[in-house]
UniProtKB/Swiss-Prot annotation:
The keyword ATP-binding does not apply. This is Enolase. Belongs to the enolase family. Pathway: Carbohydrate degradation; glycolysis; pyruvate from D-glyceraldehyde 3-phosphate: step 4/5. Its cofactor is Mg(2+). It catalyses: (2R)-2-phosphoglycerate = phosphoenolpyruvate + H2O. HAMAP family: Enolase. GO terms for molecular function: magnesium ion binding; phosphopyruvate hydratase activity.
Length: 424
C-alpha cells in the first residue's frame, strides 16, 4: 500500500444554511495534498442518531456553538490519527471511534469525527489525483442517481401548518441527471407561478422548497400534480411524487397516536393518498419506535411503493440489520452524519443492498456548500438522492456537482432510478 501520512488537521467553526455553527475540517498529508469537508446538521433528528456535539453556551449562537467539537478535532483526534496512512480509511475511522469510546459518539461528537473522516478520504483522493466518487467507489461507480426534489416544505422545515415535512417530485422519465434537473426546475418555477396566482406565499423553507400556508397535505399534493401537468409532464409516468412524513414529529409517545389517530388510521391515510396520487415513495410514514405501525405499513404498501426508513434506521448498520430481520420498510435513507464515519456509512449501504433494500443518499436541512453527498451517491451507486429543491445555493451545489460528474463519466455514466416501483 502506498504510504502517505496524515501530517496535520485544520478546523474552524463556520455557519450552515440556517445560520447555525458547524465544522469545517481540512486534513493535510505529508505529500502536501489535502481534503476538506463541512459537516451538515439536521432539524428533525432520530433519537438514536450519533450525537452532534454542541456547546450549550447560551452566550454564543443561542447555545449551538461547536467549539467543544472543534477542540476535540485539534486536541484529541489529531494526535491519534497523525502519522496514519491516508489510504487506510478503515483504520483512520476505527481509531477515532475507539478514541471516543461511546456507542453514539457523544464524547467527542459525531460532527468532529465525521469532518475528519470525510476530509481524510478526500485527501486520499487528491493524493491519487482521482475524483472523490472514483476513489471511494472504484471503477464500477457509474450510476447517476434520480433526485427527490423537495418542492413544498412543511413540518419542522417550515412554519406553515403542513403536517408532513417534505412533498417531493421525482423526475423518473429523465434519461440523464442534466435532464432531471431541468425537469425539476421547470416544475419548480411553474409551481411558483401557481402559488402567486393563488396569492400564496412563495418564501422557501430550510430545504429550498416553497412553504405556503395550506390547509392539508392533499392540497400540497394537488398543487404538485397541477404544476407537473402545466409544465408539460405526465404525473406518474414522467414525474412521480414522494413524501417524507417525518411522523415522529407529530407522534404522541404517551397516547401512541398521530394527532389523535391510531397507527392503523395513519396507515389508512397513507394508503388513501397513494390511491389518489402518483406516489411511489414514502419516508418515515410512522414514528421511529412505532414498530407495529411500521409492520402494518410495510405489509399494506411494501409491494406497491418504496417504504423508506430514516429515523427508523439512522444509517446505523445494527438498526438496519434489525429492521431487515423484521421485514420493516424496503429502503434506507443514508445520512453520513447520523452515524459519523465514512466506513460505517459504507457498511450501512452495503448491508442494505445485499438484502435487497434500496438506498437514498440524503442531505440535512442544515447544509453547506459541501457537495460530498453527490459524490457518495455515485460512489455507492445508490440510484437515488435527496438534496432539496431547485433553489438555495447549498442545494443547487449538489445538483451542479452531479451534472459535472455526469459530464466526466461520459458514455460510461448511467442515469438510473433504483426505486423498483417507479412509474407503476
Amino acid at each position: 500500500m502506498l504510504e502517505v501520512a496524515i501530517s496535520d488537521i485544520q478546523a474552524r467553526e463556520i455557519l450552515d444554511s440556517r445560520g447555525y455553527p458547524t465544522l469545517y475540517v481540512k486534513v493535510i498529508t505529508d505529500a502536501g495534498t489535502f481534503g476538506e469537508a463541512c459537516v451538515p446538521s439536521g432539524a428533525s433528528t432520530g433519537i438514536k442518531e450519533a450525537l452532534e456535539l454542541r456547546d450549550h453556551d447560551t452566550s454564543r449562537y443561542q447555545g449551538k456553538g461547536v467549539l467543544q467539537a472543534l477542540n476535540n478535532v485539534k486536541e484529541v483526534l489529531l494526535p491519534v490519527v497523525q502519522g496514519v496512512n491516508i489510504f487506510d480509511q478503515i483504520l483512520i475511522d476505527s481509531i477515532m471511534v475507539e478514541a471516543d469510546g461511546t456507542p453514539n459518539k457523544e464524547k467527542l461528537g459525531a460532527n468532529a469525527i465525521l469532518g475528519i473522516s470525510l476530509a481524510a478520504a478526500k485527501a486520499a483522493a487528491a493524493t491519487l489525483g482521482q475524483p472523490f466518487y472514483r476513489y471511494v467507489g472504484g471503477c464500477f461507480s457509474h450510476v447517476l442517481p434520480c433526485p427527490m426534489m423537495n418542492l413544498i416544505n412543511g413540518g419542522m422545515h417550515a412554519n406553515n401548518g403542513l403536517q408532513f415535512q417534505e412533498f417531493m417530485i421525482r423526475p423518473i422519465g429523465a434519461t440523464s441527471i442534466k435532464e432531471a434537473v431541468r425537469m425539476g426546475a421547470d416544475v419548480f418555477h411553474t409551481l411558483k407561478k401557481l402559488l402567486n396566482d393563488k396569492n400564496l406565499a412563495t418564501g422557501v423553507g430550510d430545504e429550498g422548497g416553497f412553504a405556503p400556508q395550506l390547509k392539508s397535505n392533499s392540497e400540497a399534493l394537488d398543487l404538485l400534480v397541477l404544476a407537473i401537468e402545466k409544465s408539460g409532464f405526465q404525473p406518474g409516468k414522467e414525474i412521480s411524487l414522494a413524501l417524507d412524513c417525518a411522523a415522529s414529529s407529530f407522534y404522541d409517545t404517551k397516547t401512541k397516536t398521530y394527532e389523535g389517530k391510531s397507527y392503523q388510521e395513519q396507515v389508512e391515510i397513507l394508503a388513501d393518498l397513494c390511491d389518489r396520487y402518483p406516489i411511489d415513495s414514502i419516508e418515515d410514514g410512522l414514528a421511529e419506535e412505532d414498530f407495529d405501525g411500521w409492520d402494518l405499513l410495510t405489509a399494506e404498501l411494501g409491494d406497491a411503493i418504496q417504504i423508506v426508513g430514516d429515523d427508523l434506521f439512522v444509517t446505523n448498520p445494527e438498526l438496519i440489520a434489525e429492521g431487515i430481520s423484521k421485514g420493516r420498510a424496503n429502503a434506507v435513507l443514508i445520512k453520513p452524519n447520523q452515524i459519523g464515519t465514512l466506513t460505517e456509512t459504507s457498511e450501512a449501504i452495503q448491508l442494505a443492498h445485499n438484502q435487497g433494500y434500496t438506498t437514498i443518499l440524503s442531505h440535512r436541512s442544515g447544509e453547506t456548500e459541501d457537495t460530498t453527498i453527490a459524490d457518495l451517491a455515485v460512489a455507492f451507486n445508490t440510484g437515488q438522492i435527496k438534496t432539496g429543491s431547485l433553489s438555495r445555493s447549498e442545494r443547487i451545489a449538489k445538483y451542479n456537482r452531479l451534472m459535472a460528474i455526469e459530464e466526466e463519466l461520459g458514455p460510461v455514466g448511467l442515469f438510473k432510478d433504483s426505486n423498483p416501483f417507479s412509474g407503476e
